[in-house]
């Protein structure tokens, strides 16, 4: 019978799992030898306990022992090698490390044990155990231990654990601040936590109370940190009654002279609303309150229909919410602005004197006192808690007329007229004064004049002319700088009243006029308007003064131009 030759294995092939199973059996045998003291050639001593081991196994798994047992080192022949520090915790941690080295797996029971094992594994250079400890800690992460684990993450550069700790701190801020670890934070850590715009708090009162709880934990030593911490509390978002009863009446704050400017800023915001311009008046990202952009009325694509809609847009969620329609919506080319979180709309075609207020609290439109002079193509802005209706057109001529509205007395009064009559100009308040930029003059010719009103002196003056001659302009102010767009210009221009200097800020993707412009979340938003073909658009762009970048945003719900556009703070749960 002919023998069949044995089939030769191809080089490099092996039975499935043969190598890994073989390695596992070797580790299991070595671990059994370690536990029984068989063939061990070194003893590790930690916390009063001895651990017989094999130098070869330790050297294979640990960079520290590999170097320690290298040829020429005096410790190479040592029978006993101490592993510090000499504490019971070190012994327990070393037991876990050796189980890992010998393939017995990692069994962790508590966060402090995992932190001790992690520290020892780092010292001994045991690769892989670091990741196992990090995964265990991530699985045990809770609000109660988030601050402690954040310190562990920082100490050992565990990026994933640090990110998860930060998320828990933001999402469970109120619960975190109730634990003792919060009271032991360093001032820098408390300030950084309070400053986070993404804290998930329903009310800013929770942030204020956390700051004061930390200070009162050791008031004599910490009262000097009050101003620094209070800078990160958004005092204008507190309920006015709470501010009076809990903040201004607080003895620690009364004794802190450095805190007084912050309290005065909050008071100004209660009186003036967003006009005060305080960054601390912006709601945090995940509050129920948020800045929303309100778009009111306007003309359709061809300019034939007057749109009745009023809608609020939340940029963070990109969600539109309908509001009650503007009464008398058949008017166009009216003016709008926000004052103390209410929206005012005045005038409109043809020659209307009407003024309506949208109460954001009552969610309804209320008619208030009419202007003395009917007008459209004018502008209206808020300055020092009052409204100013500026210039415009009455059907016969462009107007020099300026009227001031006092919301407390519900009355309009004429003030010093414009040096030069204009309509369709850009108007913006900035640094306590009123600026009227460009527009169409009495002869119908566009002007580049910048007319400045000082309310203290009830007097107008001229400033440096604009670098353009345009009408149908819009302007807003942000941090003592005026931003001008529209007039079918392809650029955004800035004007600094302090230096009386004009600059080009950015290029726009496409020119528009009679657009809506407002400031929301620290950015300039440009909404709708007419393009170079005279048609209304639905385009939306944002300009970030910090980066100088213009970005396209989701379009409006419909094409519109000559519309009202303001920013208010609104509850998102409505």
Swiss-Prot record:
Matching entries from SMART domains are given as: BACK, BTB, Kelch
Kelch repeats sit at 292-341, 343-385, 386-432, 434-480, 481-522, 524-570
Q: What SUPFAM superfamilies does UniProt report for this protein, alphabetically?
A: Kelch motif (SSF117281), POZ domain (SSF54695)
- Which InterPro entries does this chain map to? BACK (IPR011705), BTB-kelch_protein (IPR017096), BTB/POZ_dom (IPR000210), Kelch-typ_b-propeller (IPR015915), Kelch_1 (IPR006652), KLHL35_BTB_POZ_dom (IPR030601), SKP1/BTB/POZ_sf (IPR011333)
What Pfam families does this protein map onto? BACK, BTB, Kelch_1, Kelch_KLHDC2_KLHL20_DRC7
Every BTB domain range: 40-110
In this chain the BACK domain maps to 146-248
The keyword DNA damage is annotated on this UniProt entry: no
Q: Which residues form a coiled coil?
A: none
Q: Which keywords annotate this record? A: Kelch repeat, Repeat
Q: Does the keyword Protein transport apply?
A: no
Write down the PANTHER family for this protein, in alphabetical order: KELCH PROTEIN, KELCH-LIKE PROTEIN 35
Record protein name field:
Kelch-like protein 35
Species per Swiss-Prot/TrEMBL record: Mus musculus (Mouse)
State the gene name recorded for this protein: Klhl35
């Amino acid at each position: 019978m002919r023998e069949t030759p044995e089939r030769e294995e191809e080089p490099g092939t092996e039975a499935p799992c043969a190598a890994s199973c073989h390695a596992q059996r070797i580790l299991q045998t070595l671990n059994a030898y370690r536990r029984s003291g068989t063939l061990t050639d070194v003893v590790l001593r930690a916390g009063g306990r001895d651990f017989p081991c094999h130098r070869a196994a330790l050297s294979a798994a640990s960079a520290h022992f590999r170097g320690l047992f290298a040829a020429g080192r005096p410790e190479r022949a040592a029978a006993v090698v101490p592993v510090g520090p000499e504490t019971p915790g070190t012994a327990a941690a070393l037991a876990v490390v050796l189980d890992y080295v010998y393939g017995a797996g990692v069994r962790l029971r508590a966060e402090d044990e995992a932190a001790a094992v992690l520290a020892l594994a780092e010292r001994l250079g045991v690769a892989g155990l670091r990741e196992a400890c990090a995964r265990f800690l991530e699985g045990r992460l809770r609000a109660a231990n988030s601050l402690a684990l954040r310190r562990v993450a920082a100490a050992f550069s565990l990026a994933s654990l640090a990110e998860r700790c930060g998320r828990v701190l933001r999402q469970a801020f109120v619960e975190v601040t109730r634990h003792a670890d919060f009271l032991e934070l360093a001032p820098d850590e408390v300030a950084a936590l309070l400053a986070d715009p993404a804290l998930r708090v329903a009310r800013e009162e929770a942030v204020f109370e956390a700051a004061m709880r930390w200070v009162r934990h050791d008031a004599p030593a910490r009262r000097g940190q009050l101003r620094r911490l209070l800078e990160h509390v958004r005092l204008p978002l507190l309920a006015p009654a709470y501010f009076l009863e809990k903040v201004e009446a607080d003895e620690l704050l009364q004794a802190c002279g450095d805190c007084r400017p912050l309290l005065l800023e909050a008071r100004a915001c209660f009186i003036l609303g967003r006009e005060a311009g305080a960054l601390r008046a912006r709601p945090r990202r995940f509050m129920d309150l948020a800045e929303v952009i309100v778009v009111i009325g306007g003309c359709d694509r061809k300019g034939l229909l007057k749109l009745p809609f009023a809608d609020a847009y939340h940029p963070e969620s990109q969600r539109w919410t309908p509001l009650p329609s503007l009464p008398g919506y058949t008017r166009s080319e009216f003016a709008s602005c926000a004052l103390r979180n209410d929206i005012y709309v005045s005038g409109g075609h043809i020659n209307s004197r009407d003024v309506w207020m949208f109460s954001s609290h009552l969610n309804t439109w209320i008619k208030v006192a009419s202007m003395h002079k009917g007008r459209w193509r004018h502008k209206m802005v808020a300055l020092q808690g009052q409204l100013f209706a500026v210039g415009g057109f009455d059907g016969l001529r462009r107007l020099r007329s300026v009227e001031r509205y006092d919301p407390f007395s519900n009355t309009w009064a004429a003030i010093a007229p414009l040096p030069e009559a204009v309509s369709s100009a850009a108007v913006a308040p900035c640094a306590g004064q009123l600026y009227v930029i460009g527009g169409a003059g009495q002869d119908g010719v566009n002007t580049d004049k910048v007319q400045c009103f000082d309310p203290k002196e009830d007097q107008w003056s001229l400033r440096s002319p604009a670098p353009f001659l345009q009408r149908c302009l819009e302007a807003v102010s942000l941090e003592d700088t005026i931003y001008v767009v529209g007039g079918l210009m392809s650029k955004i221009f800035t004007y600094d009243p302090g230096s009386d200097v004009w600059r080009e800020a950015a290029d726009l993707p496409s020119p528009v006029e009679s657009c809506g412009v407002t400031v929301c979340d620290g950015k300039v938003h440009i909404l709708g308007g007419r393009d170079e073909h005279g048609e209304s658009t639905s385009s939306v762009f944002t300009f970030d003064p910090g980066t100088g970048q213009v970005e396209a945003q989701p379009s409006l719900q419909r094409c519109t131009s000559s519309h009202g556009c303001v920013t208010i703070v609104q509850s998102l749960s409505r």
